């Protein structure tokens, strides 16, 4: 039995916030409580001074083998406390099927959005994907969801569209309208990338339904979340009211510190905090870097640590339909656990890579060092100092 003792457990789903022990037996959580008994046969780890949280869910990344530019899935996820990752549309209906066997062998739980482009993002970084609805393989998309969608017990959770002006071109928001219409026909949600949109962000938000996700919510390329008065646009509040999810997934350029500061000051916080990392952006300072660094950045921006953990555990688990298997530390559920050591140090967080134009930075004073990751009761990452 694995017993993690004396850690400060933060579990928003169960409203746990305090120092407790947690025991995992086999692949599941057995018990959480004070001063749990242990024997010489148990693997006992002292987590005093550390936070113990549910295994993180990175709701937006691009991972191998689904993406040519994908990050190394297990190595990058486990080293940052991530036990569930969502690939955000790296593949389309022509190539998703060929990766099923590999996904089944990964210990990380990989969920995925299916790109409306038949070949997904395979053309990147050389050229942009073709999202013209006239070129969609609608029958192929339907077949993918029939075979591999959540209703069939698979990993596909919805449709993905990047609606940047250079991608949709003269079609503008018609592509998003058609994507949402297709999502309605298939009974799935839509994730839309909004950086550099082809028109006012307000018009984009009006198209989205309850359960859809707008990602890169704090981007600052093209029309953004903040109006000329410095206020969050009313259409964003209206979209949230009707159940649209807002995701902060920042990558190297899908984030603007002034936009985030203004929105957070007005109480417009993310539903999900993710990375949108690839092998081109993982571990790159001063941008998204990893989920651990995203936690540090958003706490530096003024969001309480407990709320940030909610945005990286319970909230995405609910949206993905995984509350019975991820996003909480619940007895009888899979033992997916992450342990972070708070380290007080100055860290620069930026919204563009070093040397880029129009870069803004802030200085944070605390980072959260991943020291232990447990997946299904197995220690899959442990820092040498822990």
Predicted regions and their residues:
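C-terminal cap of metal-dependent C-N hydrolases
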Residues: 334-386
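Metal-associated gating/positioning segment near the N- to mid-region
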Residues: 46-105
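Divalent metal-coordination and catalytic microenvironments
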Residues: 7, 27, 49, 60, ...
């Amino acid at each position: 039995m694995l017993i993690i003792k004396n850690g400060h457990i933060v579990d928003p789903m169960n409203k746990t916030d305090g120092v407790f022990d947690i025991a995992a037996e086999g692949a599941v959580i057995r018990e959480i409580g004070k001063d749990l008994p242990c024997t010489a046969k148990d693997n006992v780890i002292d987590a005093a001074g550390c936070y113990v949280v549910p295994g993180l869910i990175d709701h937006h990344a691009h991972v191998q083998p689904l993406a040519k530019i994908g990050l190394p899935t297990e190595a990058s996820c486990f080293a940052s406390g991530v036990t569930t990752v969502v690939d955000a549309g790296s593949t389309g209906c022509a190539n998703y099927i060929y990766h099923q066997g590999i996904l089944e062998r990964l210990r990380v739980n990989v969920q995925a959005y299916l790109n409306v482009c038949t070949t997904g993002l395979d053309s990147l970084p050389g050229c942009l994907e073709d999202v013209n609805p006239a070129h969609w393989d609608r029958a192929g998309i339907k077949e993918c969801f029939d075979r591999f969608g959540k209703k069939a017990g698979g990993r596909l959770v919805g449709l993905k569209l990047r609606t940047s002006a250079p991608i949709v071109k003269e079609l503008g928001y018609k592509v998003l309208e058609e994507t949402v219409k297709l999502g309605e026909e298939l009974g799935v949600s839509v994730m839309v990338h909004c950086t550099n949109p082809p028109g006012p962000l307000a018009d984009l938000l009006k198209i989205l339904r309850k359960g859809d996700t707008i990602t890169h919510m704090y981007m600052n390329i093209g029309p953004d979340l903040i109006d000329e008065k410095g206020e969050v646009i009313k259409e964003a509040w209206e979209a949230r009211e009707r159940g649209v999810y807002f995701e902060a997934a920042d990558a190297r350029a899908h984030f603007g510190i002034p936009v985030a500061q203004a929105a957070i000051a007005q109480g417009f916080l993310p539903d999900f905090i993710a990375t949108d990392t690839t092998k081109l952006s993982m571990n790159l300072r001063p941008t998204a870097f990893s989920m651990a660094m995203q936690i540090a950045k958003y706490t530096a921006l003024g969001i309480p640590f407990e709320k940030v953990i909610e945005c990286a555990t319970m909230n995405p688990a609910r949206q993905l339909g995984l509350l019975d298997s991820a996003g909480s530390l619940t007895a009888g559920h899979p033992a997916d656990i992450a342990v972070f050591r708070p380290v007080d140090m100055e860290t620069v967080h930026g919204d563009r890579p070093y040397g880029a134009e129009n870069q803004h930075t802030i200085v944070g004073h605390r980072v959260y060092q991943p020291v232990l990751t447990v997946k299904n009761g197995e220690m899959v990452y442990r820092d040498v100092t822990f």
